[in-house]
Amino acid sequence: MLKPLSADKWNYAMAAHLLNRAGFGGPPAEIQKLADLDHDQAVASLLDYEKIPDPTANPDWARPDPTRIERFRAAKDASPEEKRKLQQDEQRLQRQRMLELRGWWLQRMATGPRPLQEKLVLFWHGHFATSADKVRDAYYMWRQNELFRRLATVNWQMLLLEAGKD
């Protein structure tokens, strides 16, 4: 087992290292804020992220789209040319939303108030190996990442069960 870091070794460089390991690094002011705490407080501030308010707004489209079902129903009775056009429009919309989702998530990772939570979301996202190419719907990708955010630190069985339902 690792020995706890002695108080005299806790400094700015160690705080930067901790922030790199538990998150995605941070600006000098954030590193200094951690360095000003003692080691245990710094670790606790990253681990107890549920206590930190998260003001990040969700993307505008991050909710069920009631018009999507209607668009698919309309396509059922459409001519082959109209179906192709509707399909292209839907694919274009989903590609745009997927780009927005990626930007939104990268922003959360880079500047969000809960770096460990986002690092865990990225870990679980990679572990369960879902991709935009398979899902093709930004809302469902966002929803899965929200599941990982909510359950990032719960027990494995619960996460596995919920991810299986998702």
PLM-predicted stretches and their roles:
Residues 16:
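Extreme N-terminus nucleophile/cap motif
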Residues 1-10, 26-36, 40-44, 90, ...:
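Primarily short, surface-exposed interaction patches in extracytoplasmic proteins
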Residues 19:
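N-terminal cofactor/phosphate-binding cores enriched in small/glycine residues
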Residues 12-13, 26-96:
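Active-site-surrounding "flap" and adjacent substrate/cofactor-binding loops of secreted or lumenal enzymes
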